[in-house]
């Protein structure tokens, strides 16, 4: 509907432009080149509309990439939480609910990752985590409360399960493309298997005594479990949680005790938090480097914006592993 209205608006603008351009001309039938261009654009958009592609709404850049890998250009993909923004802190806008209400299919993470939108998503969406075995879903004790860890995408095996759910949902949406989606799924799953080998080879190349990953918030526990690298962060699984002085001090003591030489900022968190860790470690005689700045931050809760390094799941994972390996070896 929105596109149709936009096309009508552009056509009306074209007519207005034509009347101005033709003022004083010999015949009213004379059309400017600009008007013709507008009309061609309108026709092109009308043709695009006639293809009637289904609208798939996704909550995050991870799922946007997943759908694009599986469905290519057979669907229109609309993203709710822009790449680079923190999903834990994202507040839904009125237009987000408009997208959801007009979606033919909505895919979301589940596991309380989209907590502020969960009611709307559960009402009509598909959680890609819905088939995860319960014993594979991570939990943490935060202040005596057991919290579900939503960062499953750092366990590539779980991510593969999510791909399977997304593929089935797309096949149900567009049965005529089932063979194409199946072919793309098989290809993508093979690429993810190769990614797992890449990650394992690189992380195991880090000496065991140096294999510690310090980040601003607890987003890497699935990564830790899958690749035998101990992780620690002063903040919990959600960036909404409070950062207690005790947690900061415990992290500082951990850095000093294990002689950790590098700690990592994340693309969606405040790098100032890592400065506190560096200063605290320095006060105890430890020299620790903060790995941060454009192109040197870990991706945790979002992929990079389109066109930047890390704008696909596989590229994001390789970026993270390269950064970790280079700074901890």
Describe each region flagged by the PLM:
Residues 7-13:
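Sec-dependent N-terminal signal peptides
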Residues 2, 8, 22-329:
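Extracytoplasmic metal-acquisition and chelation regions
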């Amino acid at each position: 509907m929105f596109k149709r209205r936009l096309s009508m608006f552009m056509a009306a603008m074209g007519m207005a432009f034509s009347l101005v351009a033709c003022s004083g001309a010999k015949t009213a039938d004379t059309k400017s080149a600009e008007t013709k261009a507008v009309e061609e654009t309108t026709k092109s958009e009308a043709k695009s509309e006639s293809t009637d592609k289904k609208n798939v709404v996704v909550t995050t850049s991870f799922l946007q990439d997943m759908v694009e890998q599986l469905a290519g250009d057979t669907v229109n993909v609309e993203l709710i939480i822009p790449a680079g923004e923190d999903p834990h802190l994202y507040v839904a806008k009125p237009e987000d609910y408009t997208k959801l209400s007009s979606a033919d299919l909505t895919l979301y993470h589940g596991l309380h990752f989209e907590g502020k939108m969960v009611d709307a998503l559960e009402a009509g969406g598909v959680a890609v985590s819905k088939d995860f075995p319960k014993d594979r879903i991570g939990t943490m004790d935060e202040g005596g409360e057991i919290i579900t860890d939503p960062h499953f995408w750092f366990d590539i095996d779980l991510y593969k399960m999510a791909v399977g759910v997304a593929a089935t949902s797309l096949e149900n949406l567009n049965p005529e493309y089932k063979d194409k989606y199946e072919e793309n799924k098989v290809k993508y799953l093979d690429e993810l298997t190769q990614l797992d080998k890449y990650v394992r080879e690189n992380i195991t190349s880090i000496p065991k005594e140096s294999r510690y990953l310090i980040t601003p918030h607890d987003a890497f526990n699935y990564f830790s479990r899958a690749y035998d690298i101990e992780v620690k962060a002063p903040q919990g699984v959600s960036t909404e949680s409070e950062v207690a002085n005790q947690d900061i001090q415990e992290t500082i003591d951990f850095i000093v005790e294990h002689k950790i030489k590098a700690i990592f900022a994340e693309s969606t968190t405040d790098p100032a938090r890592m400065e506190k860790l560096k200063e605290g470690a320095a006060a105890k005689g430890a020299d620790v480097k903060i790995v941060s700045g454009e192109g040197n931050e870990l991706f945790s809760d979002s992929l990079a914006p389109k066109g930047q390094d890390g704008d696909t799941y596989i590229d994001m994972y390789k970026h993270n592993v390269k950064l970790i390996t280079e700074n901890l070896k």
